[in-house]
Structure formats: structure tokens, C-alpha cells
């Protein structure tokens, strides 16, 4: 009666040892890699930053900040079309915080501006303003957009809004 128990115990030990031996080596922690990417960005080493950011999103597909930074770097490197794809894919994610949504729409506006798709850039800024009507950057961007297009009526209107926003921000400081 003890022989079957010993055989089961030996098989169990061999199974556990095999599991741990063939288990993939633990990858570096996502946050550590993300920190390395941010450090590379600070140093101006965008290629290394992009490599680290790709590693982060391979390990954690929910790391929205890594995707945002990746898209921003691609745009800065002249690949705005790839940046649009990355940033656009983030818009369909559920349960994003407002500050993340603001960053996504800002990035998309800049992507579209670089591609000279001003109507789409405007749409993204307007979506941003729906989330935060007093966003200084968005109002200034929209003003510059209307000035580029020669739409002076809308530029005047935004200019007035911008003055109000600046007054509110000055009084809060």
C-alpha cells in the first residue's frame, strides 16, 4: 500500500521540478522598463526610449501612458501616420480617466496637424474642449488653427474665450 503512495509522490516531485525548470525566466518589471524609457527620453535618446516602450506594451497592453509616449515619439520622428494609429486605438478603451483622454486628444490633434489634416485636428481639439472647456493649450491651438485657415470670425471668438480663460487662471494663482 505504501508503494503506490511513494510512486505518486515521486511523480509529483518530478512534475513540480519540471514545471519550475521550464518556466520562462521572469521578465524585467514593466515599471522598471518604463522608467528606463523615460530616462532615455530625458537624455534625448528616442531610439532607446522607443525600444523600451515597445517592451513595456508587449508585457502590459493596458499601459496607456507607454502607448501615448510611443505615439508622441513617432510623431516627433516624422512618422505621424503611425502615431495616429497608436493614439486612435487608445480612444476606444473603456474607463479612461479624463486626464488620459485629454492627453489622447491633444496627441491626436498634433498628429493630424503634422499630417496637414486640419479639420481632423480641429475635431480632436473640440473633443478635448468638451472635456475641459478652460484648457489653455486647446484654446490656443484652436486660435492658431483658425488663423492658419484665415477664419477670422472664429479666431476672434476663440480669442475672446482665451482672454477669459487666462483671466480665470491668473486670478487662481
Regions picked out by a protein language model, each given a short descriptive name:
Residues 1-26:
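N-terminal signal-anchor transmembrane alpha helix of single-pass membrane proteins
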Amino acid at each position: 500500500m505504501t508503494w503506490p503512495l511513494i510512486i505518486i509522490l515521486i511523480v509529483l516531485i518530478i512534475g513540480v521540478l519540471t514545471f519550475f525548470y521550464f518556466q520562462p525566466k521572469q521578465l524585467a518589471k514593466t515599471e522598471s522598463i518604463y522608467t528606463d524609457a523615460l530616462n532615455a527620453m530625458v537624455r534625448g535618446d528616442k531610439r532607446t526610449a522607443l525600444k523600451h516602450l515597445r517592451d513595456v506594451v508587449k508585457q502590459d497592453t493596458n499601459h496607456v501612458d507607454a502607448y501615448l509616449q510611443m505615439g508622441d515619439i513617432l510623431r516627433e520622428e516624422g512618422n505621424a501616420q503611425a502615431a495616429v494609429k497608436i493614439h486612435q486605438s487608445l480612444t476606444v478603451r473603456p474607463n479612461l480617466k479624463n486626464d488620459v483622454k485629454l492627453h489622447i486628444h491633444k496627441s491626436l490633434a498634433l498628429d493630424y496637424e503634422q499630417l496637414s489634416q486640419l479639420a481632423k485636428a480641429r475635431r480632436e481639439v473640440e473633443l478635448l474642449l468638451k472635456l475641459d472647456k478652460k484648457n489653455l493649450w486647446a484654446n490656443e491651438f484652436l486660435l492658431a488653427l483658425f488663423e492658419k485657415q484665415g477664419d477670422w470670425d472664429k479666431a476672434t471668438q476663440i480669442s475672446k474665450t482665451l482672454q477669459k480663460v487666462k483671466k480665470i487662471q491668473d486670478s487662481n494663482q
